[in-house]
C-alpha cells in the first residue's frame, strides 16, 4: 500500500525546522571556535606582561648590582684616599713632633746658656780654633812664633778684644798615654789648648769639626766661631775686622767658596766613599768653604751643637760643613781675602793696601813645608800691630 503524499504545508514546516536546526548548530559551532582564540589573546597578553615585569626585575637587579659595584669601588677608593691622607697627616705630625723636640731642646739649650752666661760663660767676639794633631808640635811652635799671640798677649786680646785663640785637639786611643801626656805638658806651658772628647784620627775630621763647634759654644758666647788649620798664616786683625762687617746679619757662613771634584777612586787623597750621592762620575761637590779656614756665626754653631746627633758626616770635613749649611737659610760669603797665596801674592796685596786675612798654598792645602816657611810668610805678609789695636768689640 502506498503512503499518502505529504501535504505542501508539512513540507514547508519541515524545511523551516531543518533550517532553524542548522542555524542553531552553526551558531554554536562558530561560537565554540572563537572562544579559544580570545583566550589565546588574553594569555599571550598576560605572558607578555609577565615577561616585561620579569625583564624590569632583571634590569632593576642589574642596576642594583652595578650600583653596588660602583659603591664598593667608590668606597675602596675613598678608603685608599683616607689611608693616604692619614699617612700624610702622620708624616706631618712626626715632622712637627721632631721640630717641637728640637725646639724644646733648643729652648732648654738657650735657657742653660743664658744661665751660664750670667755665671761663667765669657762673652767674646770670636773663637778661633786652630786644628792640630799630636804629631804637629813643630807646626804649633811655628804658629806661636809668628801670628798667634802667646802668654800675657794671648790673655790680653781675649780680655780686651774678645778674641779667643786655641789649638784644638782630642785624645789618643790610649787615654792617659804618652801622646796625651805630651799635650798636657805643652798646655801647662802655653795654656792655649781646647781639648775635645774625641779620639784623634785623620779620617775623623768631620766628627772633630762637629765636636769643636759644640764644645766651643758650650764654653764661649761668641759672635763667630772660626776653624783654621795649623799650616795657614793668619792676620788676626784683618780676620776679625772682616768678620765684624757681617756681625749684624744672621746665619753667616764665610770663607773661600769652592767646588772641587768628587774623587771616587780608592786610595787617593780626599777619596769620597759616598761619591754616588753626588751624581754621575766626574761631578763636582756643591759650593762650600775650603777647609783651610772658614767661619760661621753664632746661630749656625748653635744649630750644629743642637743637632749634632743627626748631622751626616762625609769623608772631607769641609764638605760635611757645607752639607750641613746647604739645607738652611744661610748666607754664603765668598771672602777671597781668606785664601791669598803665599809670597809674592800676599806680599803684593799688602803693599797695595789689601792685607790678607789668611794665606796658604792651594797646591799643598796649606803652606808648603809650613814649619820652615811660616816665619818667611809672616815677615812678608804680616799686617803689623795697627789692625788688631784698632779693633773694638762691644759687649
From Swiss-Prot:
Name its cellular compartments: Golgi apparatus membrane
A single Gene Ontology MF term assigned here is: hexosyltransferase activity
Naming one, the record's GO cellular component terms include:
Golgi membrane
Q: What is its EC number?
A: 2.4.1.-
- Glycosylated residues are 117
Cofactor dependence: Mn(2+)
How does this protein sit in the membrane?
Answer: Single-pass type II membrane protein
Name the pathway it acts in.
Answer: Protein modification; protein glycosylation
**An example of a Gene Ontology BP annotation on this entry?**
protein glycosylation
Keywords tagged on the record: Glycoprotein, Glycosyltransferase, Golgi apparatus, Manganese, Membrane, Signal-anchor, Transferase, Transmembrane, Transmembrane helix
InterPro entries documented for this protein: DUF4094 (IPR025298), Glyco_trans_31 (IPR002659)
Answer yes or no on keyword Cell membrane. Answer: no
Q: Where are the transmembrane segments?
A: 5-27
Q: Which Pfam families match?
A: DUF4094, Galactosyl_T
**Enzyme class of the recorded protein, top EC level:** transferase
Which PANTHER family does the UniProt entry name for this protein? BETA-1,3-GALACTOSYLTRANSFERASE 8-RELATED (PTHR11214:SF275), BETA-1,3-N-ACETYLGLUCOSAMINYLTRANSFERASE (PTHR11214)
Q: What does this protein do?
A: Beta-1,3-galactosyltransferase that transfers galactose from UDP-galactose to substrates with a terminal glycosyl residue.
Q: Tell me which family the UniProt entry assigns to this protein.
A: Belongs to the glycosyltransferase 31 family.
Report the protein name in the record.
Probable beta-1,3-galactosyltransferase 8
User: What is the organism of origin for this protein?
Assistant: Arabidopsis thaliana
Q: What is the lineage of its organism?
A: Eukaryota, Viridiplantae, Streptophyta, Embryophyta, Tracheophyta
Amino acid at each position: 500500500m502506498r503512503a499518502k503524499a505529504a501535504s505542501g504545508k508539512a513540507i514547508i514546516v519541515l524545511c523551516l525546522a531543518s533550517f532553524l536546526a542548522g542555524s542553531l548548530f552553526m551558531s554554536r559551532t562558530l561560537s565554540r571556535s572563537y572562544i579559544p582564540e580570545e583566550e589565546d589573546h588574553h594569555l599571550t597578553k598576560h605572558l607578555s606582561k609577565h615577561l616585561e615585569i620579569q625583564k624590569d626585575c632583571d634590569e632593576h637587579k642589574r642596576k642594583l648590582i652595578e650600583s653596588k659595584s660602583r659603591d664598593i669601588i667608590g668606597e675602596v677608593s675613598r678608603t685608599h684616599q683616607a689611608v693616604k691622607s692619614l699617612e700624610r697627616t702622620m708624616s706631618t705630625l712626626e715632622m712637627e713632633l721632631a721640630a717641637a723636640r728640637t725646639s724644646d731642646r733648643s729652648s732648654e739649650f738657650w735657657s742653660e746658656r743664658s744661665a751660664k752666661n750670667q755665671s761663667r760663660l765669657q762673652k767674646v767676639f770670636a773663637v778661633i780654633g786652630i786644628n792640630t794633631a799630636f804629631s804637629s808640635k813643630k807646626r804649633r811652635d811655628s804658629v806661636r812664633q809668628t801670628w798667634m799671640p802667646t802668654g800675657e798677649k794671648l790673655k790680653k786680646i781675649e780680655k780686651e778684644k774678645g778674641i779667643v785663640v786655641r789649638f784644638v785637639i782630642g785624645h789618643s786611643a790610649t787615654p792617659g798615654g804618652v801622646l796625651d801626656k805630651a799635650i798636657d805638658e805643652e798646655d801647662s806651658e802655653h795654656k792655649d789648648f781646647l781639648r775635645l772628647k774625641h779620639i784623634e784620627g785623620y779620617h775623623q775630621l768631620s766628627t772633630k769639626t762637629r765636636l769643636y763647634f759644640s764644645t766651643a759654644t758650650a764654653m764661649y758666647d761668641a759672635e763667630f766661631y772660626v776653624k783654621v788649620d795649623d799650616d795657614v798664616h793668619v792676620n788676626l786683625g784683618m780676620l776679625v775686622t772682616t768678620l765684624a762687617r757681617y756681625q749684624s746679619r744672621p746665619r753667616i757662613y764665610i770663607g773661600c767658596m769652592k767646588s772641587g771634584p768628587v774623587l771616587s777612586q780608592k786610595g787617593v787623597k780626599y777619596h769620597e766613599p759616598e761619591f754616588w750621592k753626588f751624581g754621575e762620575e766626574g761631578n763636582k761637590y756643591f759650593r762650600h768653604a775650603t777647609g783651610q779656614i772658614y767661619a760661621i756665626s753664632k746661630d749656625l754653631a748653635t744649630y750644629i751643637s743642637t743637632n749634632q746627633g743627626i748631622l751626616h758626616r762625609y769623608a772631607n770635613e769641609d764638605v760635611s760643613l757645607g752639607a750641613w749649611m746647604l739645607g738652611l737659610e744661610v748666607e754664603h760669603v765668598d771672602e777671597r781675602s781668606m785664601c791669598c797665596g803665599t809670597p809674592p801674592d800676599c806680599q803684593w796685596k799688602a803693599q797695595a793696601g789689601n792685607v790678607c786675612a789668611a794665606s796658604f798654598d792651594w797646591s799643598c792645602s796649606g803652606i808648603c813645608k809650613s814649619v820652615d816657611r811660616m816665619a818667611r810668610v809672616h815677615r812678608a805678609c804680616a799686617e803689623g800691630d795697627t789692625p788688631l789695636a784698632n779693633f773694638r768689640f762691644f759687649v
